[in-house]
Protein backbone atom coordinates (compact mmCIF):
# COMPACT_ATOMS: atom_id res chain seq x y z
CA UNK A 1 0.00 0.00 0.00
CA UNK A 2 2.84 2.28 0.80
CA UNK A 3 4.31 1.74 -2.56
CA UNK A 4 0.99 2.40 -4.19
CA UNK A 5 0.70 5.61 -2.20
CA UNK A 6 4.13 6.64 -3.22
CA UNK A 7 3.31 6.06 -6.86
CA UNK A 8 0.06 7.96 -6.59
CA UNK A 9 1.87 10.95 -5.09
CA UNK A 10 0.88 10.26 -1.44
CA UNK A 11 -2.65 10.40 -0.16
CA UNK A 12 -4.09 9.54 -3.57
CA UNK A 13 -2.94 12.84 -5.08
CA UNK A 14 -1.42 12.82 -8.51
CA UNK A 15 2.08 14.21 -8.63
CA UNK A 16 2.48 17.41 -10.67
CA UNK A 17 5.56 17.59 -12.78
CA UNK A 18 6.90 20.78 -14.24
CA UNK A 19 7.44 20.79 -17.91
CA UNK A 20 10.93 21.48 -19.01
CA UNK A 21 11.31 24.97 -20.46
CA UNK A 22 10.92 24.91 -24.19
CA UNK A 23 14.08 25.53 -26.04
CA UNK A 24 14.15 28.88 -27.75
CA UNK A 25 14.15 28.53 -31.52
CA UNK A 26 17.40 29.43 -33.09
CA UNK A 27 17.26 32.64 -35.04
CA UNK A 28 18.64 32.85 -38.49
CA UNK A 29 20.74 35.90 -39.29
CA UNK A 30 21.21 36.86 -42.89
CA UNK A 31 24.73 37.93 -43.70
CA UNK A 32 25.54 40.82 -46.00
CA UNK A 33 26.47 38.38 -48.78
CA UNK A 34 23.00 36.80 -48.68
CA UNK A 35 24.00 33.54 -46.88
CA UNK A 36 22.11 32.39 -43.79
CA UNK A 37 23.99 31.76 -40.52
CA UNK A 38 22.25 29.58 -37.92
CA UNK A 39 22.62 30.08 -34.20
CA UNK A 40 21.26 32.29 -31.46
CA UNK A 41 22.38 35.84 -32.21
CA UNK A 42 21.35 39.18 -30.83
CA UNK A 43 18.97 41.40 -32.82
CA UNK A 44 21.76 43.89 -33.35
CA UNK A 45 23.91 41.35 -35.22
CA UNK A 46 21.55 41.10 -38.22
CA UNK A 47 22.92 42.67 -41.37
CA UNK A 48 21.05 45.06 -43.62
CA UNK A 49 19.62 45.03 -46.15
CA UNK A 50 18.17 41.60 -45.36
CA UNK A 51 18.26 38.91 -47.99
CA UNK A 52 14.49 38.44 -47.73
CA UNK A 53 11.44 40.66 -47.78
CA UNK A 54 10.46 42.04 -44.38
CA UNK A 55 6.79 41.61 -45.27
CA UNK A 56 7.36 37.84 -45.33
CA UNK A 57 7.96 37.78 -41.56
CA UNK A 58 4.78 36.45 -39.97
CA UNK A 59 5.46 37.57 -36.41
CA UNK A 60 4.10 41.10 -36.06
CA UNK A 61 6.52 42.27 -33.37
CA UNK A 62 9.52 40.83 -35.16
CA UNK A 63 8.36 42.35 -38.44
CA UNK A 64 7.93 45.78 -36.82
CA UNK A 65 11.39 45.54 -35.22
CA UNK A 66 13.05 44.62 -38.50
CA UNK A 67 11.25 47.40 -40.37
CA UNK A 68 12.22 50.01 -37.74
CA UNK A 69 15.87 48.98 -37.89
CA UNK A 70 15.78 49.00 -41.69
CA UNK A 71 14.41 52.58 -41.68
CA UNK A 72 17.12 53.64 -39.22
CA UNK A 73 19.77 52.13 -41.47
CA UNK A 74 18.33 53.98 -44.46
CA UNK A 75 18.45 57.30 -42.58
CA UNK A 76 22.05 56.70 -41.51
CA UNK A 77 23.14 55.92 -45.06
CA UNK A 78 21.34 58.98 -46.41
CA UNK A 79 22.91 61.25 -43.79
CA UNK A 80 26.37 59.80 -44.44
CA UNK A 81 25.95 60.39 -48.19
CA UNK A 82 24.94 64.02 -47.54
CA UNK A 83 27.98 64.62 -45.31
CA UNK A 84 30.29 63.05 -47.88
CA UNK A 85 28.85 65.20 -50.67
CA UNK A 86 29.19 68.31 -48.50
CA UNK A 87 32.86 67.55 -47.79
CA UNK A 88 33.52 67.03 -51.50
CA UNK A 89 31.86 70.34 -52.40
CA UNK A 90 33.87 72.17 -49.73
CA UNK A 91 37.08 70.60 -51.03
CA UNK A 92 36.35 71.64 -54.63
CA UNK A 93 35.38 75.16 -53.63
CA UNK A 94 34.47 77.29 -56.65
CA UNK A 95 35.03 74.33 -58.97
CA UNK A 96 32.16 72.39 -57.42
CA UNK A 97 29.31 71.58 -59.85
CA UNK A 98 26.02 73.47 -59.37
CA UNK A 99 23.42 71.94 -57.12
CA UNK A 100 20.78 69.93 -59.01
CA UNK A 101 17.33 71.49 -59.25
CA UNK A 102 14.73 69.35 -57.40
CA UNK A 103 12.06 67.78 -59.59
CA UNK A 104 8.55 69.10 -59.06
CA UNK A 105 5.25 68.70 -60.86
CA UNK A 106 5.48 72.22 -62.25
CA UNK A 107 9.03 72.14 -63.66
CA UNK A 108 8.60 68.65 -65.16
CA UNK A 109 5.59 69.58 -67.25
CA UNK A 110 5.69 69.73 -71.01
CA UNK A 111 5.06 73.18 -72.47
CA UNK A 112 1.38 73.68 -73.23
CA UNK A 113 0.88 75.13 -76.70
CA UNK A 114 -2.52 76.54 -75.72
CA UNK A 115 -0.94 79.21 -73.52
CA UNK A 116 -2.69 82.50 -74.23
CA UNK A 117 -0.71 85.45 -75.56
CA UNK A 118 -2.45 88.65 -74.37
CA UNK A 119 -1.20 90.51 -77.47
CA UNK A 120 -2.68 87.99 -79.90
CA UNK A 121 -5.36 89.43 -82.21
CA UNK A 122 -7.44 86.25 -82.05
CA UNK A 123 -7.47 86.36 -78.25
CA UNK A 124 -8.50 90.01 -78.30
CA UNK A 125 -11.35 89.22 -80.69
CA UNK A 126 -12.55 86.34 -78.49
CA UNK A 127 -12.54 88.59 -75.43
CA UNK A 128 -14.57 91.23 -77.26
CA UNK A 129 -17.25 88.74 -78.34
CA UNK A 130 -17.52 86.18 -75.53
CA UNK A 131 -20.18 85.96 -72.82
CA UNK A 132 -18.23 88.21 -70.43
CA UNK A 133 -17.75 91.09 -72.88
CA UNK A 134 -20.67 93.07 -71.43
CA UNK A 135 -19.06 92.96 -67.98
CA UNK A 136 -15.56 93.95 -69.13
CA UNK A 137 -17.05 96.71 -71.28
CA UNK A 138 -18.72 98.02 -68.10
CA UNK A 139 -22.19 97.62 -69.57
CA UNK A 140 -23.38 95.47 -66.65
CA UNK A 141 -22.52 95.31 -62.96
CA UNK A 142 -22.29 91.95 -61.18
CA UNK A 143 -25.20 90.74 -59.07
CA UNK A 144 -24.74 87.27 -57.58
CA UNK A 145 -27.20 84.70 -56.25
CA UNK A 146 -25.73 82.15 -53.81
CA UNK A 147 -27.71 79.03 -53.00
CA UNK A 148 -27.14 75.47 -51.78
CA UNK A 149 -28.23 71.93 -52.44
CA UNK A 150 -31.50 70.70 -50.93
CA UNK A 151 -31.68 70.58 -47.12
CA UNK A 152 -28.27 72.09 -46.38
CA UNK A 153 -26.57 71.64 -43.03
CA UNK A 154 -25.07 74.32 -40.84
CA UNK A 155 -21.53 74.21 -42.23
CA UNK A 156 -22.72 74.75 -45.80
CA UNK A 157 -25.06 77.56 -44.77
CA UNK A 158 -22.27 79.35 -42.90
CA UNK A 159 -19.99 79.05 -45.93
CA UNK A 160 -22.63 80.70 -48.12
CA UNK A 161 -23.12 83.51 -45.61
CA UNK A 162 -19.38 84.16 -45.42
CA UNK A 163 -19.05 84.10 -49.20
CA UNK A 164 -21.73 86.77 -49.39
CA UNK A 165 -19.52 89.05 -47.27
CA UNK A 166 -16.58 88.46 -49.62
CA UNK A 167 -18.43 89.04 -52.91
CA UNK A 168 -20.16 92.45 -53.07
CA UNK A 169 -23.82 92.63 -54.09
CA UNK A 170 -24.39 88.90 -53.49
CA UNK A 171 -27.58 87.46 -52.02
CA UNK A 172 -28.13 84.12 -50.26
CA UNK A 173 -31.35 82.21 -50.95
CA UNK A 174 -32.36 78.71 -49.93
CA UNK A 175 -33.39 76.18 -52.57
CA UNK A 176 -36.64 75.00 -50.98
CA UNK A 177 -36.70 71.99 -53.27
CA UNK A 178 -36.62 73.95 -56.55
CA UNK A 179 -34.68 72.56 -59.50
CA UNK A 180 -31.89 74.66 -60.99
CA UNK A 181 -33.69 74.78 -64.33
CA UNK A 182 -36.51 76.65 -62.59
CA UNK A 183 -34.21 78.89 -60.56
CA UNK A 184 -32.16 80.11 -63.55
CA UNK A 185 -35.10 81.81 -65.40
CA UNK A 186 -36.11 83.56 -62.17
CA UNK A 187 -32.52 84.79 -61.71
CA UNK A 188 -32.43 86.15 -65.26
CA UNK A 189 -35.76 87.93 -64.72
CA UNK A 190 -34.35 89.61 -61.60
CA UNK A 191 -31.16 90.75 -63.36
CA UNK A 192 -28.75 88.39 -61.62
CA UNK A 193 -25.51 87.99 -63.57
CA UNK A 194 -24.17 84.84 -61.87
CA UNK A 195 -25.45 81.86 -59.93
CA UNK A 196 -23.32 80.02 -57.35
CA UNK A 197 -24.51 76.67 -55.99
CA UNK A 198 -22.70 75.02 -53.05
CA UNK A 199 -23.20 71.24 -52.91
CA UNK A 200 -22.49 69.10 -49.88
CA UNK A 201 -21.94 65.47 -48.94
CA UNK A 202 -22.12 64.14 -45.37
CA UNK A 203 -22.64 67.65 -44.00
CA UNK A 204 -19.45 68.90 -45.68
CA UNK A 205 -19.28 71.22 -48.73
CA UNK A 206 -17.77 69.24 -51.59
CA UNK A 207 -18.78 70.97 -54.84
CA UNK A 208 -19.40 74.36 -56.44
CA UNK A 209 -21.36 75.21 -59.59
CA UNK A 210 -20.75 78.63 -61.14
CA UNK A 211 -23.10 79.66 -63.94
CA UNK A 212 -22.83 82.97 -65.76
CA UNK A 213 -26.18 84.43 -66.76
CA UNK A 214 -27.97 84.72 -69.07
CA UNK A 215 -25.95 82.79 -71.71
CA UNK A 216 -23.42 80.81 -69.72
CA UNK A 217 -20.93 79.21 -69.50
CA UNK A 218 -21.29 76.92 -66.49
CA UNK A 219 -18.35 75.49 -64.56
CA UNK A 220 -18.48 72.61 -62.10
CA UNK A 221 -15.75 72.44 -59.44
CA UNK A 222 -14.84 69.93 -56.79
CA UNK A 223 -14.42 71.70 -53.45
CA UNK A 224 -12.08 70.56 -50.69
CA UNK A 225 -10.07 71.83 -47.70
CA UNK A 226 -12.86 74.17 -46.59
CA UNK A 227 -12.00 76.33 -43.59
CA UNK A 228 -14.51 78.76 -42.13
CA UNK A 229 -13.48 81.92 -40.30
CA UNK A 230 -13.62 80.44 -36.81
CA UNK A 231 -11.38 77.56 -37.92
CA UNK A 232 -8.55 79.85 -39.12
CA UNK A 233 -5.87 80.66 -36.57
CA UNK A 234 -4.79 84.25 -36.03
CA UNK A 235 -7.54 85.51 -38.30
CA UNK A 236 -8.45 89.16 -38.57
CA UNK A 237 -11.70 90.87 -37.74
CA UNK A 238 -14.74 90.41 -39.95
CA UNK A 239 -14.39 91.97 -43.41
CA UNK A 240 -15.82 95.38 -44.07
CA UNK A 241 -18.23 96.34 -46.86
CA UNK A 242 -15.45 97.77 -49.04
CA UNK A 243 -15.11 96.30 -52.54
CA UNK A 244 -12.05 94.00 -52.45
CA UNK A 245 -9.23 93.83 -54.93
CA UNK A 246 -9.04 90.59 -56.95
CA UNK A 247 -5.84 88.73 -57.89
CA UNK A 248 -5.77 85.96 -60.52
CA UNK A 249 -2.55 83.93 -60.71
CA UNK A 250 -1.44 81.47 -63.43
CA UNK A 251 -4.63 81.43 -65.52
CA UNK A 252 -2.55 81.34 -68.71
CA UNK A 253 -4.01 78.57 -70.89
CA UNK A 254 -7.15 78.99 -73.00
CA UNK A 255 -9.18 77.01 -70.49
CA UNK A 256 -7.61 78.87 -67.57
CA UNK A 257 -8.22 82.20 -69.32
CA UNK A 258 -11.95 81.43 -69.53
CA UNK A 259 -12.11 80.35 -65.88
CA UNK A 260 -10.21 83.45 -64.80
CA UNK A 261 -12.65 85.70 -66.60
CA UNK A 262 -15.53 83.90 -64.85
CA UNK A 263 -14.02 84.65 -61.44
CA UNK A 264 -13.24 88.25 -62.40
CA UNK A 265 -16.85 88.87 -63.44
CA UNK A 266 -18.01 88.17 -59.87
CA UNK A 267 -16.45 91.36 -58.49
CA UNK A 268 -17.10 95.02 -59.36
CA UNK A 269 -14.60 96.89 -61.52
CA UNK A 270 -13.44 99.56 -59.11
CA UNK A 271 -11.96 98.11 -55.89
CA UNK A 272 -11.93 100.32 -52.83
CA UNK A 273 -8.27 100.19 -51.82
CA UNK A 274 -9.02 102.03 -48.59
CA UNK A 275 -10.54 98.78 -47.28
CA UNK A 276 -7.18 96.96 -47.85
CA UNK A 277 -9.00 93.72 -48.72
CA UNK A 278 -7.94 91.32 -51.47
CA UNK A 279 -9.46 88.09 -52.83
CA UNK A 280 -6.92 85.74 -54.44
CA UNK A 281 -7.52 82.87 -56.88
CA UNK A 282 -4.18 81.07 -57.25
CA UNK A 283 -3.97 78.34 -59.90
CA UNK A 284 -1.25 75.77 -59.28
CA UNK A 285 -1.00 72.06 -60.18
CA UNK A 286 -4.52 72.34 -61.68
CA UNK A 287 -5.93 73.33 -58.29
CA UNK A 288 -7.40 76.75 -57.57
CA UNK A 289 -6.65 78.02 -54.06
CA UNK A 290 -8.94 80.74 -52.74
CA UNK A 291 -7.80 83.09 -49.97
CA UNK A 292 -9.21 86.33 -48.58
CA UNK A 293 -6.73 88.67 -46.89
CA UNK A 294 -6.35 92.17 -45.52
CA UNK A 295 -3.21 94.24 -45.95
CA UNK A 296 -1.49 95.38 -42.74
CA UNK A 297 0.82 98.35 -43.33
CA UNK A 298 3.48 98.18 -40.61
CA UNK A 299 5.53 101.04 -42.01
CA UNK A 300 6.20 102.79 -45.30
CA UNK A 301 8.34 99.86 -46.49
CA UNK A 302 6.92 96.84 -44.65
CA UNK A 303 3.53 95.33 -45.45
CA UNK A 304 1.96 92.23 -43.94
CA UNK A 305 -1.21 90.27 -44.67
CA UNK A 306 -3.89 88.99 -42.34
CA UNK A 307 -6.23 86.23 -43.46
CA UNK A 308 -9.92 86.88 -42.98
CA UNK A 309 -11.45 83.68 -44.35
CA UNK A 310 -13.06 81.60 -45.58
CA UNK A 311 -10.59 79.50 -47.53
CA UNK A 312 -11.09 76.52 -49.84
CA UNK A 313 -9.59 74.67 -52.79
CA UNK A 314 -11.30 74.10 -56.16
CA UNK A 315 -10.60 71.63 -58.94
CA UNK A 316 -12.35 72.01 -62.28
CA UNK A 317 -14.49 69.02 -63.31
CA UNK A 318 -16.30 70.35 -66.37
CA UNK A 319 -17.01 73.48 -68.38
CA UNK A 320 -20.36 73.58 -70.15
CA UNK A 321 -21.68 75.94 -72.78
CA UNK A 322 -24.81 77.86 -71.85
CA UNK A 323 -26.56 77.65 -68.51
CA UNK A 324 -26.81 74.55 -66.36
CA UNK A 325 -28.24 71.58 -68.27
CA UNK A 326 -27.09 68.18 -67.05
CA UNK A 327 -29.08 66.24 -69.66
CA UNK A 328 -28.66 68.01 -73.01
CA UNK A 329 -25.82 70.42 -72.24
CA UNK A 330 -22.84 70.76 -74.58
CA UNK A 331 -19.52 70.50 -72.78
CA UNK A 332 -16.43 72.45 -73.80
CA UNK A 333 -14.15 70.53 -71.43
CA UNK A 334 -14.58 67.51 -69.13
CA UNK A 335 -12.07 66.15 -66.66
CA UNK A 336 -10.74 62.76 -67.74
CA UNK A 337 -8.24 60.56 -65.95
CA UNK A 338 -6.38 59.74 -69.17
CA UNK A 339 -5.81 63.45 -69.78
CA UNK A 340 -3.51 63.51 -66.74
CA UNK A 341 -1.33 60.58 -67.88
CA UNK A 342 0.82 63.11 -69.73
CA UNK A 343 2.64 66.05 -68.17
CA UNK A 344 1.38 68.42 -70.85
CA UNK A 345 -1.42 69.90 -68.74
Swiss-Prot record:
One of its GO terms (cellular component) is preribosome, large subunit precursor. It holds the Pfam family Brix. Keywords: Nucleus, Ribosome biogenesis, RNA-binding, rRNA processing, rRNA-binding. Residues 142-325 form the Brix domain. Residues 303-320 are annotated as: RNA-binding. It is found in: Nucleus, Nucleolus. SUPFAM superfamilies: Class II aaRS ABD-related. This is Ribosome production factor 1. It comes from Rattus norvegicus. The lineage of its organism: Eukaryota, Metazoa, Chordata, Craniata, Vertebrata. The gene is Rpf1.
Amino acid sequence: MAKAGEKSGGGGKRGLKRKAPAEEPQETAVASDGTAESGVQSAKAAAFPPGFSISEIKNKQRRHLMFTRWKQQQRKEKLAAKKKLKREREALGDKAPPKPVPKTIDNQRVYDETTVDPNDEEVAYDEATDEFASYFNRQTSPKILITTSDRPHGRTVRLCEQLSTVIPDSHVYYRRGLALKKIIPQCIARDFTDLIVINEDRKTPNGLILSHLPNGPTAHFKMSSVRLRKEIKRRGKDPTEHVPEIILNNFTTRLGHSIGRMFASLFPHNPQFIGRQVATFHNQRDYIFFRFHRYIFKSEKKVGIQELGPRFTLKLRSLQKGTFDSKYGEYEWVHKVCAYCSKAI
